Design a protein with these regions (language model features):
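Long, contiguous bundles of hydrophobic transmembrane helices that form the permeation core
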Residues: 2-53, 330-486, 591-682, 710-719
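Conserved, well-structured core domains of diverse proteins
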Residues: 2-142, 148, 152
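Membrane-water interface regions at transmembrane-helix termini and the short interhelical loops
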Residues: 62-66, 86-97, 152-168, 319-326, ...
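Interfacial loop-to-helix junctions that mark the boundaries of transmembrane helices
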Residues: 65-74, 96-102, 136-145, 202-210, ...
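Core transmembrane alpha-helical segments of multi-pass membrane transporters/permeases
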Residues: 112, 156, 160, 164-165, ...
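Membrane-interfacial loop-to-helix junctions in multi-pass transporters
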Residues: 144-149, 201-214, 240-254, 285-291, ...
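Transmembrane alpha-helix interface/packing and boundary motifs in multi-pass membrane proteins
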Residues: 163, 222-226, 257-266, 298-304, ...
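Hydrophobic transmembrane alpha-helices that form the pore/transport pathway of multi-pass ion
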Residues: 235-303, 309-316, 322, 546-580, ...
Length: 719
């Protein structure tokens, strides 16, 4: 571990620059990183407030029973309050401990507009659509309906928060939808504001509901998982596993990004975090800078489709499709495997073409050092286990978070102290394994989980007090709560804005209009509808966060594919989910690729095109499961042989396409062979026995011809 940390530090220092340079890259390509500068006492206060926000989210979801119509605006009000504290009016503000008066006013007013709803819930609900007659203030002869005023102000302040944290693209999209409500559907101001602000189909709809529960808790879990040091462990394991192979550092980037992507749902964040280590290593091995940046960007973007934590959009998918999240995880396994396999094969063929070697084994981490650290993945194992046996996502996330706390404290100790700090795991493991056996109606049945949690927490506190562990442990826990709370802000704002779009679609019946338009435009052909949906997803994704992109597509295009074209509902939503993600590496606005290019010091557009070429699987796989649902374990044909045949043909197809794109199979090839391999690969990924055999024949012919050419070269060399 120490050897690899040394290697990592050298890579960052020599190629990327200082950690300040890495932060600068994050701020350039990731709006969430552009925060105010707080120092000293104000920084400590803000740190505690944000940590308390994270703690409140856990307590609210686990132990406080609250009406959904009260919980959602309360959550969004707190998010708005913190957004104005963290994010300045314009990018790059460097004033220390400074928050202008207008930000203070907007923070207070915005929070109040949303807090007013839960504080007066019964009266507002009873008023129904007659909100203009409730809470009326009379000024002379003018009657001012406060609820409409609060709705307008609250919505506008939400838009300003979105501009600061997320960006303008989603605001422009929302503005078009709102204009349609007024000008296209002929709705009046009262109707629009009532539906957008006071119902559970608009701003306070399903997206913000899922965000305030599952997404928020999993974001906090992700922050704690990072605090355990599991990301470094993943990178070390990837180095030990494939670092020695041909073009090792690129393969390390693929494997480590796939693993680290389970922890973080940000394409740009993953690219910068793991890329600061892997990109310099790839360049040092001999990969061109634009290719090195592209490998990391494509791999990090794929982290959002990697089970078990697939980014915020996956939780929304579970809610919108009405499928348990456990099934979402299972159905995403094969597509994710094929995606990363495609990238892995691409970097392999590129390494062979360039004649690149791996890293010396003596420079790589040793398994005898890594295996004792296997406990670091315990929270992930527990999370998956609890979800699979039927715990709610919220419960699984909270208990897995507590495992993270224990694991983080263990990881910072040495020798026997590790065993002492592991004692709280005993009641936690007991609860995890036995809670489903607690008999309903008994004390343990009603309170067993809470009791085990309380015992574990008490042991944790006692351990900390008696053992006097590493002084960094407690600050690390506070930092994790702070990071978790802060990471909830951008997702919350994006979900709120996407709720405006979803609200307009519901209120105006726009969804049915779009279904009719696309069905007519495609003339009933599914492939045309799929291509149009893909283009919409990619265009929207150019600047719109994955979560918001998915919500927009799930409320507009997914119903078109499902209702209008007869596509399976799960396949339709997964199709939109995939193409919303690949927008991060698709030119011209490919933020993850641009972040990778900044670290690699390569041309941004060349890096983006290389990333698109490497991630070609992401543009093919959705079409495979759209036409053959067995790939995502949906339908009546889900049998072992049918799934196995799809995986085998898709794997061979990915290999053929990757080989053709990189220009190497077992030797350099001419353009005609490259085109033939890409065409043959596409035939193999198209469902059907005839196309599979035709594609396989092309691959075999090219392989045989290359072997013949190799023999000719050897014969000529021996003469």
């Amino acid at each position: 571990m120490a050897e690899n940390e040394k290697l990592n530090n050298v890579a960052v220092d020599n190629d990327v620059g200082t950690m300040e340079d890495v932060d600068a890259i994050m701020k350039k390509y990731d709006r969430e990183s552009n925060t105010r500068v707080w120092e000293g006492t104000p920084r400590k206060i803000l740190r505690v407030l944000t940590a308390l926000f994270g703690i409140f989210l856990i307590v609210m979801n686990m132990w406080i029973k609250m009406d959904e119509r009260a919980r959602r605006p309360l959550f969004l009000g707190l998010v708005i309050l913190l957004v104005f504290i963290y994010y300045p009016i314009k990018k790059g503000s460097q004033k220390v401990n400074y928050m202008p008066w207008y930000d203070i006013v907007m923070a207070a007013v915005g929070a109040f507009c949303f807090f007013f709803y839960p504080l007066n819930l019964e009266k507002i609900v009873s008023a129904g659509t007659r909100i203009q007659k409730a809470f009326v203030v009379q000024i002379g002869s003018i009657s001012i309906p406060l609820l409409i005023v609060f709705a307008i102000i609250g919505t506008l302040i939400l838009v300003e928060c979105c501009r600061r944290v997320v960006g303008m693209p989603i605001i422009c999209v929302a503005a078009v939808f709102v204009l349609y409500a007024f000008l296209g559907a002929g709705k009046d101001l009262k109707t629009v504001m009532y539906n957008l602000f006071y119902t559970t189909t608009g701003i306070l709809g399903t997206p913000i509901g899922v965000c305030s529960t599952y997404i928020a808790l999993f974001v906090i879990f992700g922050a704690f998982l990072e605090a355990t040091g599991v990301a470094n462990f993943f990178i070390d394991c990837a180095n030990a596993l494939v670092g020695w192979a041909s073009g090792g550092p690129a393969k390390v980037a693929v494997v480590s990004s796939a693993l680290c992507g389970m922890v973080s749902g940000s394409s740009v964040g993953n690219t910068v975090t793991t890329g600061s280590v892997t990109i310099p290593m790839m360049k040092k091995t001999g990969y061109p800078p634009e290719f090195a940046g592209a490998v990391e960007a494509a791999s990090s973007t794929g982290g959002q489709i990697m089970p078990p934590i697939m980014g915020a959009a996956a939780f929304l998918m579970a809610e919108m499709v009405g499928v348990p999240y456990a099934k979402i995880i299972v159905r995403a396994i094969l597509p994710a495997f094929l995606y990363f396999l495609g990238i892995f094969l691409g970097v392999h063929f590129k390494a062979k073409k360039l004649g690149l070697k791996g890293l010396p084994r003596e420079e790589l981490p040793k398994w005898k050092i890594l295996l004792p650290q296997i406990y670091l993945i315990l929270p992930l194992v527990v999370l998956v286990y609890m979800i699979m046996i039927g715990f709610t996502m919220a419960t699984a996330a909270v208990y897995a978070t507590l495992y993270c706390v224990v694991v983080a404290m263990i990881s910072r100790e040495e020798g026997k102290k590790k065993l002492v700090m592991a004692i709280p795991l005993i009641p936690l493991l007991f609860m995890t394994l036995m809670s489903r056996s607690f008999e309903p109606g008994t004390f343990m049945g009603e309170n067993g989980s809470t009791l085990c949690l309380a015992i574990a927490f008490a042991l944790l506190v006692i351990n900390y007090a008696i053992s006097k562990p590493n002084v960094k442990s407690l600050p690390t826990i506070i930092d994790a709560f702070e990071n978790g709370g802060k990471n909830c802000l951008s997702v919350g704002i994006a979900c709120g804005m996407a709720g405006i779009i979803a609200g307009v679609v519901t209120m105006t019946g726009l969804g049915q209009v779009l279904i009719g338009a696309i069905v007519g435009l495609s003339n009933g052909h599914l492939i045309i509808a799929l291509v149009l949906t893909m283009l919409c997803c990619i265009v929207l994704g150019m600047g719109v966060p994955t979560t918001a992109n998915y919500i927009i597509m799930a409320t507009t295009c997914a119903p078109i594919l499902a209702s209008g074209m007869g596509l399976n509902l799960m396949a339709a939503h997964m199709f939109c989910f995939y193409f919303g993600i690949v927008a991060d590496i698709t030119p011209p606005v490919a933020l993850a690729a641009y972040a990778g290019s900044a670290i690699a010091k390569a041309p941004p557009m060349k890096t983006a095109w290389n990333a698109t070429r490497l991630a070609i699987a992401a543009f093919i796989i959705p079409y495979i499961f759209a036409y053959n649902n067995a790939l995502i374990f949906v339908g009546n044909d889900v049998k072992f042989l049918s799934v196995a045949s799809i995986v085998i043909s898709a794997t061979l197809g990915m290999a053929s396409i990757a080989s053709g794109l990189m220009g190497y199979l077992i030797r350099d090839m001419k353009w005609i062979s490259r085109i033939a391999l890409v065409a043959g690969g596409l035939l193999m990924v198209i469902p059907g026995t005839v196309t599979d055999l035709a594609g396989l024949a092309v691959l075999v012919v090219v392989l045989v011809l290359q072997r013949i050419e190799n023999k000719k070269d050897k014969a000529a060399a021996s003469v």
